[in-house]
């Protein structure tokens, strides 16, 4: 039997532009603007590197991490907060730079929309962990690492905690798939 071999391939990577976001005004989910446990606003715009995907044209979707947890307040739960996970819709526009510029393009970014992540079925949370925005038909996820029912297995499909780590748009463009670092999950959400 012949031994199989695999060939490693590499692709060159070129930095072509650097963009910036103005995080001072927060994201578009103004209903979450109240202070989190660590004192930061619940609609802080940042950390959008957990997932980025091209949707179409110059539209991109990005997932922030489970919320702002760089401000220490409770190391027992990794300083995670009750931040409601979300994804953002951005317009990114490249414009050619002059030949003398350090990078070939400049990048303009504009936040168009913020979509909070929720389920129609009641999610399970730790005691007193349900987000205050929940209503009879909308159950929001939470970025807090201890916001789950410990009596249920970690594979429980309605676990209320969620740490988004990737995003992909469906072929029809109507849905997104988002992976969860807290469990072996990939969720489908409407756009």
Task: Outline where the language-model segments fall.
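Sequence/structural signature of beta-propeller domains
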Residues: 2-191
């Amino acid at each position: 039997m012949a031994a199989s071999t695999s060939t490693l391939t590499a692709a060159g990577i070129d930095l072509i532009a650097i963009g910036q976001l103005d995080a001072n005004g927060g994201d578009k989910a103004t209903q979450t603007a109240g202070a989190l446990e660590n004192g930061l606003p619940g609609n802080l715009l940042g950390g959008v590197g957990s997932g980025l995907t091209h949707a179409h044209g110059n539209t991109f979707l990005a997932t922030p991490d489970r919320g702002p947890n760089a401000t220490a307040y409770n190391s027992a739960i990794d300083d995670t907060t009750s931040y409601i996970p979300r994804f953002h819709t951005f317009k990114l526009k490249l414009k050619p730079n002059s030949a003398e510029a350090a990078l070939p393009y400049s990048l303009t970014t504009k936040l168009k929309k913020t979509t909070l992540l929720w389920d129609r079925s009641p999610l399970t949370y730790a005691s007193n962990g349900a987000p205050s925005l929940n209503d009879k038909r909308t159950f929001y996820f939470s970025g807090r690492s201890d916001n789950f029912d410990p009596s249920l297995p970690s594979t429980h499909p309605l676990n209320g905690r969620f740490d988004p780590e990737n995003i992909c748009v469906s072929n029809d463009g109507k849905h997104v798939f988002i992976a969860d670092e807290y469990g072996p999950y990939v969720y489908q959400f409407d756009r």
